[in-house]
């Protein structure tokens, strides 16, 4: 079965259903990636650097040969790793995977060819992670109907937000996404904060998922900066203009 190259719109619509294989280098993935994507690097960070240098200094074909030399010895281990990823998912009989690299070029094409040869149904992202980032930024220009929970420090804003979530109300937990507990506790007891780019990725995907089934979103009143990440400017302006539900606790 031939590899299918799809748009970012199609790719995003399939992200909740099938495993996402990010074939960029480990450092690229560590900086920021799609939510729930698995890291399956075609090249190590050093190999990527060497191939890039060869491309600039010697040209395309010598760089491709070098890349193939790196790729060849990894083929079996990469297939084995994908088998483990598939087995870890809810449907072990699923043979569909989504693959992307930085710009939808040779890295994703190479891994997609291998997995297609092995019998998987493979979809690659046209434009790669770069197209995804454009999609992420576009989510912050959409008009949302926010219901903003405000109140003084200690009034229970976060607890109220989580109570709404427990009642199946649609919420966005900005502090949770940022791994930060607000002005009082900061990142005490939290995982390391994500990069700004990763924060945006997680936030965009949360907005997309909620608005697929709800026309409003509960959100906590925040300053624009949460730890060392910032709420995107256009989204923050929307929050400022949205209806505020102030918790006036005696």
What are these regions (language model features)?
Residues 1, 26, 30-76, 80:
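Glycine/alanine-rich phosphate-binding loops at beta-alpha junctions
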Residues 106-107, 145-166:
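Glycine-rich phosphate-binding P-loop
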Residues 1-35, 63, 137-141, 146-150:
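Flexible, polar/low-complexity N-terminal or interdomain linker segments that lie immediately upstream
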Residues 98, 120-133, 173-178:
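A short glycine-rich beta-strand->turn/loop micro-motif centered on a GG-aromatic cluster
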Residues 20-24, 40, 172-173, 218:
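Short hydrophobic beta-strand that contains or immediately precedes a catalytic carboxylate
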Residues 166-239:
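Conserved nucleotide-sensing/catalytic segment adjacent to the nucleotide-binding pocket
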Residues 65-125:
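Catalytic cysteine-centered active loop of the rhodanese-like fold, especially the PTP/DSP P-loop
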Residues 37-40, 220-221, 238-250:
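Conserved phosphate-donor/acceptor-positioning beta-strand/loop module used by diverse small-molecule
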